[in-house]
Regions:
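Conserved active-site-proximal phosphate/metal-binding subdomains
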Residues: 20, 202-217, 221, 225-238, ...
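Residue-level detector of alpha-helix initiation sites
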Residues: 28, 243-244
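A structural signal for short, well-ordered beta-strand segments and their strand-loop junctions
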Residues: 45, 144, 238-239, 261
Length: 420
């Protein structure tokens, strides 16, 4: 019986274990996790979501404090059009985040950074160019373009000396989205090095409408592979979303995928950036505790735990400190939803905002618990301890279970021994 380790992801002469850990922000798929996955021979991701916040937390910088200080007089205003990021500070934060991660890298694997187009930051084109360029400057192995069509993203970095050297790929949820990307970038004569096909069971933002349940990953992967074949294009396809066991992964590799991208099972590893108390919430979750909603100001549906503390929280918008989802006109759907509730409840000290959430603040504080569809199965991958909590796993344990397991089985690690 075949297993994941019987396959290899090939980039030219380079061969890797065909396991990619998806990019999860804010700092959930963190440097520690990415470095460990690279050591094991796969591809780890870091995320550039709220990179200045991540830099402050990990590297003792003070970008957020300085931005808030600069725009503090604007805090009470609903008009955020004048609140801008310093491109120089974005670049510096990216160099910290990417550079330090790459310095720590060991082993034969690779480390990519996940870049969301929907992080519009009140200057979509300039801030995205800065993030992409800084990542390349800092030595990242590859970039995965996510949360958007990215029709112009290659063009932003076409003059960079590493444009044809670094591995560049895109996440799509349909052959149509891929076709649009390829047509738009045909003039550059630079194909993506890989395509991640993300299905409807993925965690966080989804590339589907609220009819997501009508789609399935296997069908979309087959359609994308067929499309590439019809266009005589040899681009590795990476299947993602709802791949919970090594046998699940092997099925996609046998179907023709070059690799799989997984994430949910790594959220409860010791290396993952989530606080341990949140990891326990993931373990405890039942299938009924998980929902897909429209709370994200990005406009994309989002999968999360219903018990996320950020749901319904009516905090004042924190755009002066954060503001990563401000569009090109300084607007954000949460600001509108918040202002509407304030108007409805004049004089109230607190309001509840149920339509949208202040994603920047709550993701920074780990109060929106984004998750994959199969999060409710995590409790079956480990042991419950005497105190009722669940034993955390190591990234190596989870990675190697994907790599070597067969017959739909999950190798539960040995129970931890209590220290007297």
């Amino acid at each position: 019986m075949r297993r994941v380790d019987d396959f290899r992801l090939r980039f030219g002469k380079r061969e890797l274990v065909p396991i990619v850990i998806g990019g999860m922000g804010v700092d959930i798929s963190n440097a520690d996790l990415a470095v460990e996955v690279a050591r094991l021979g796969g591809i780890g991701h870091i995320s550039d979501a709220m990179v200045q916040t991540v830099s402050d937390r990990r590297y003792d910088t003070n970008f957020v404090k300085q931005k808030l200080k600069k725009y503090k007089a604007n805090v009470a205003s609903s008009d955020k059009s004048g609140v801008h990021f310093s491109l120089g500070e974005i670049e510096e934060a990216m160099r910290h985040h990417v550079g330090r991660t790459m310095e720590a890298k060991r082993g034969e694997g690779m480390i990519f950074v996940n870049c969301m187009e929907k992080l519009t930051m009140n200057a979509p084109r300039d801030t995205l160019r800065t993030r992409l360029t800084a990542a390349l400057d800092a030595g990242i192995d590859g970039i995965t373009l996510s949360a958007g069509l990215h029709l112009n993203s290659f063009g932003l970095i076409e003059d960079h000396p590493r444009f044809r050297d670094a591995k560049l790929g895109i996440i799509v949820s349909s052959p149509r989205a891929l076709a649009m990307f390829l047509r738009k970038n045909a003039r550059l004569q630079r194909l993506p090095d890989f395509v991640v096909v993300e299905g409807p069971l993925a965690g966080g933002h989804l590339g589907f409408g609220m009819d997501w349940a009508q789609y399935d990953l296997a069908t979309i992967v087959a359609e994308v592979i067929a499309y590439l074949k019809s266009e005589h294009l040899d681009i590795p396809v990476i299947a993602a979303g709802g791949i919970f066991t090594g046998s699940d992964a092997t099925g996609f590799l046998e179907q023709g995928a070059a690799a799989v991208q997984v994430a949910t099972r790594f959220t409860v590893t010791q290396e993952c950036g989530l606080p341990d108390k949140v990891k326990q919430e993931y373990f405890r979750a039942s299938e009924e505790d998980i929902e897909v909603n429209t709370l994200s100001p990005t406009g994309y549906p989002m999968r999360m735990l219903k018990g996320s503390p950020g749901i319904g929280s009516g905090i004042r918008p924190n755009c002066e400190a954060y503001g990563y989802l401000l569009d090109a006109n300084g607007r954000c759907a949460y600001i509108d939803a918040y202002n509407l509730e304030v108007e409805r409840h004049p004089g109230a000290k607190k309001v509840k905002v149920m339509d949208k959430t202040c994603l920047c603040t709550h993701m920074r504080n780990f109060d929106i618990w984004t998750c994959g569809h199969y999060t409710y199965r995590l409790k079956d991958t480990t042991h419950r301890l005497d105190d009722g909590s669940y034993q955390l796993l190591s990234a190596e344990q989870v990675f190697q279970d994907y790599q070597f397991s067969t017959e739909g089985k999950i190798a539960v690690p040995a129970a931890a021994v209590a220290v007297a």
